Design a protein with these regions (language model features):
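Domain-terminus/edge residues, biased toward the C-terminal soluble/receptor-binding domains
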Residues: 78-82, 90-291
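Active-site-adjacent loops and short helices of periplasmic peptidoglycan-processing enzymes
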Residues: 1-99, 103-112
């Protein structure tokens, strides 16, 4: 819905969120910056005014964009999520849960631009028409190598804080081709979020492995092989859905396109008919042994 080179001009929609108690980059009315710079401001700095301005630019109004957010969340299978603003500022009707945030993060990882922004530790927004350059550095300790909480394999994450929600963190780690998402919420400080996330990642990497089943990777407990899985097949139109389970727990699926039976060739049909006709017209001679 936008290009990195698009130029965004800050309006009242954005600058209204520039307050002392709201995370921001102090954007000014009439200030311009590229959409790419806006992405990094929203991600690294959690700049609420930038989130609102992106929403207005893409959706025409922030309200329209929020409706797009809700529709997307529903499409992703989120069942306990509802947005009323683009930034996540507190509202009793603005909520989500750990499972839904993990689904949203998983969807984001499939987008190359999202992933590139997610992996960024430091970024500098160049000087604009109304501001000097703004250097930004990640607020995710698990991503920052200089942090004592750095986690090997962490590729990025998103922090969040409000008095009502306390500290929340959705973070991603990859090792040996396996990717895990950890979401922790309502911790009293970010250090606890990081410790909980580290414990979750350690458990996942130490307890599970990836195996190949019918050409597709599936995550199973270490030591489990494809032979240990059970399969259930379901017909979906012209495709067969093979669902695999380990001790009743779903581990993955493979979609197989059904191959239609080949249609008989007319020439072969004519040949077969001729042969059958010849057999029917050929007399059978009984042979009697002579004494």
């Amino acid at each position: 819905n936008s290009s990195p080179k698009d130029v965004v001009t800050f309006t009242e929609t954005g600058v209204r969120d520039v307050t002392w108690d709201s995370s921001n980059i102090n954007a000014q009315l009439g200030e311009t910056m590229t959409m790419k710079d806006c992405w990094f401001a929203a991600y690294i700095k959690s700049a609420n005014e930038v989130c609102a301005q992106i929403a207005e630019y893409v959706g025409g109004t922030e309200a329209n964009f929020v409706e797009m957010m809700n529709q997307k969340a529903k499409k992703l299978g989120c069942t306990h999520t509802h947005f009323v603003n683009a930034s996540g500022l507190p509202d009793e009707n603005h909520y989500s849960c750990a499972e839904d945030l993990a689904k949203i993060m998983r969807a984001g990882l499939k987008n190359a631009r999202f992933r590139k922004v997610l992996e960024t530790v430091s970024y500098t927004i160049p000087a604009t028409n109304l501001s000097a350059a703004r250097p930004l550095h990640t607020h995710v300790p698990l991503l920052a190598k200089e942090s004592s909480l750095y986690y090997e394999g962490c590729i990025g994450g998103k922090t969040g804080f409000s008095t009502e929600a306390q500290n929340c963190l959705a973070v991603v780690a990859e090792r040996n081709g396996r990717t895990y998402i950890a979401v922790t919420m309502r911790d009293t400080n970010l250090g606890i979020n990081c410790a909980d996330s580290t414990a979750l990642f350690d458990y996942a990497f130490n307890s599970f492995d990836s195996i190949e089943v019918d050409g597709k990777a599936m995550t199973v407990p270490k030591g489990v092989t494809a032979a240990d899985l059970t399969m259930e097949s379901k017909q979906k139109g012209k495709k067969t859905l093979n669902q695999y389970y380990y001790q009743g727990q779903f581990v993955g699926y493979v979609t197989v396109k059904d191959t239609p039976a080949p249609e008989p060739v007319q020439e072969a049909e004519e040949t077969l008919a001729a042969e059958e006709s010849e057999e029917e017209s050929t007399p059978v001679t009984a042979q009697t042994d002579k004494a």
